[in-house]
Amino acid sequence: MGHKVHPIGIRLGISADWNSKWYANKAEFAGYLAADLKVRQVLRKKMSQAGISKILIERPSNTACVSMHVARPGVVIGKRGEDIEMLRKQVSDIMGVSVHINVIEVRKPELDAQLVAESVAQQLERRIMFRRAMKRSVGNAMRLGALGIKISVAGRLNGAEIARSEWYREGRVPLQTLRADIGYGFSEAHTNYGVTGVKVLIYHGDIFSFSSVGQEKQDDISRGDRNADRSSRRSREVR
């Protein structure tokens, strides 16, 4: 069942982090979640040419911070910062609080799983052969230092009557190793024959330093081991 689970969801708190960081009580949670989804939808629609990798949302007290990881930051900022100011106002209206937007450049888009998935989807929409698109993206990622990459496409490939899935892989992609730093991306190509899904997994190496949540869990485990040792010593002394 290792391939059935979401590669990011299973690593949350271990080697991956959440894209939204805030706390809300039961009455506010649904509103915050809906606002986050709408903000991401609006930003991806308006800045589709910027190559958005991920959008991180934080909510400190009575404010919000939105960090956009993009391949082309100039598209987001615009001339003299006019475009980003308009975005800030729109996002502020959606979230109902003052918003600060950070634009972070993705230095190597060929190693970002989401950007690779969108690139393959765009090539499929331009009627490029799916095998050529996959092999080109895999070659670029391996050339720039990826330890492994797997790309799978599913749908009516090349206009076939029966939908099927095809995949191509180079290197290692250890999905069941929780310390593995694996990027995951998904995109859809809207072609004349229907929708074709594209999934990308990129293996960057192992993470041996724990995240904040993972470190707390490790501390709890270590604390439990120490308590067990104390209990065993006490039992021996009583005897």
Swiss-Prot record:
GO terms for biological process: translation. One of its GO terms (molecular function) is mRNA binding. Pfam families: KH_2, Ribosomal_S3_C. Keywords: Ribonucleoprotein, Ribosomal protein, RNA-binding, rRNA-binding. Residues 217-239 are annotated as: Disordered. InterPro entries: KH_dom (IPR004087), KH_dom-like_a/b (IPR015946), KH_dom_type_2 (IPR004044), KH_sf_prok-type (IPR009019), Ribosomal_S3_C_sf (IPR036419), Ribosomal_uS3_bac-typ (IPR005704), Ribosomal_uS3_C (IPR001351). Disulfide bonds: none annotated. Residues 39-107 form the KH type-2 domain. It comes from the Bacteria. The keyword Coiled coil does not apply. One of its GO terms (cellular component) is cytosolic small ribosomal subunit. Belongs to the universal ribosomal protein uS3 family. Binds the lower part of the 30S subunit head. Binds mRNA in the 70S ribosome, positioning it for translation. Part of the 30S ribosomal subunit. Forms a tight complex with proteins S10 and S14. This is Small ribosomal subunit protein uS3.
